[in-house]
């Protein structure tokens, strides 16, 4: 019978170390793809900013070690733009604002909460410096919208709350939201610090709005011919 001669055996075409590297790279590529897809779900495709869940988490974590200012930012009249010029115009306005906020990444964190609402945390506690930053943001957005006839109704409103590391994210969020509400009820297209508004003023602002809505409803129904608010 013929004897097996190892020297005559064809060389192994499979190199185990190379195969291990190939498998390792394949798995690495798969994991990178999955992570990329997960990251994509956390970012708004229009503005490129983190969406609510990621943005709020990053902001809350950052606030634990940094004093600063939480800003609740709202784009005014987005619905009006969508209704008159279509959603492409509204999306264009959102993209413009997103780009402006991305350019300020060195100043803090920004995210899109949804719709026309955005959240920012600026690592600055000086009201004068913060006011200059907000003025600059408002002016740059105004310059963009005035150059585009379809975006001429778009303006910004913002509520600001000065925060320290001792403050909770939830408390500052609520205060910034109240400051934004005050702005919305007093003409829009401006910003206010929560610390500038006392509780009685905030309460009066809300009550006044409610009374005005009731009066308008009564006038339309014909129950009252004239009501002065």
Residue ranges and their predicted role:
Residues 5-45, 52-67:
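Signal-transducing coiled-coil linker helices
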Residues 12-19, 23-26, 90, 130, ...:
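The cytosolic transmitter module of two-component sensor histidine kinases
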Residues 39-42, 51-69, 76-103, 111-115, ...:
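Conserved long alpha-helical elements within nucleotide-processing catalytic cores of c-di-GMP signaling
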Residues 61, 100, 140-143, 182, ...:
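Amphipathic alpha-helical regulatory segments at dimerization interfaces
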Residues 68, 108, 156, 189, ...:
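PAS-family sensory domain
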Residues 110, 157-165, 171-186, 192-206, ...:
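Cyclic nucleotide signaling catalytic output domains
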Residues 112-113, 139-157, 184, 188:
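Catalytic core regions of nucleotide second-messenger enzymes
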Residues 206-228:
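Active-site core of bacterial EAL-family cyclic-dinucleotide phosphodiesterase domains
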């Amino acid at each position: 019978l013929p004897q097996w001669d190892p020297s005559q055996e064809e060389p192994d075409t499979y190199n185990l170390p190379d195969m291990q590297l190939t498998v390792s790279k394949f798995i690495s590529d798969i994991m990178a793809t999955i992570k990329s897809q997960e990251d994509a779900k956390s970012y708004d495709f229009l503005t490129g900013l983190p969406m609510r869940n990621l943005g709020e988490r990053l902001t809350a974590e950052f606030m634990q070690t940094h004093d600063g200012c939480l800003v609740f930012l709202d784009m005014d009249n987005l619905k009006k733009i969508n209704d008159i010029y279509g959603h492409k115009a509204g999306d264009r306005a959102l993209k413009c604002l997103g780009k402006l906020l991305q350019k300020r990444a060195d100043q803090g964190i920004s995210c899109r909460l949804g719709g026309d609402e955005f959240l920012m945390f600026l690592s600055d506690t000086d009201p004068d410096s913060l006011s200059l930053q907000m003025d600059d943001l408002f002016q740059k957005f105004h310059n963009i919208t005035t150059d585009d006839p379809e975006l001429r109704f778009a303006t910004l409103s913002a509520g600001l709350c000065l925060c320290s590391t001792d403050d909770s994210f939830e408390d500052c969020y609520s205060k910034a939201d109240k400051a934004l509400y005050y702005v919305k009820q007093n003409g829009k297209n401006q910003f206010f610090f929560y610390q500038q508004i006392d509780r009685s003023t905030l309460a009066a602002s809300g009550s006044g709005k409610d009374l005005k809505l009731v009066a308008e409803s009564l006038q339309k129904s014909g129950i009252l011919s004239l009501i002065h608010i």
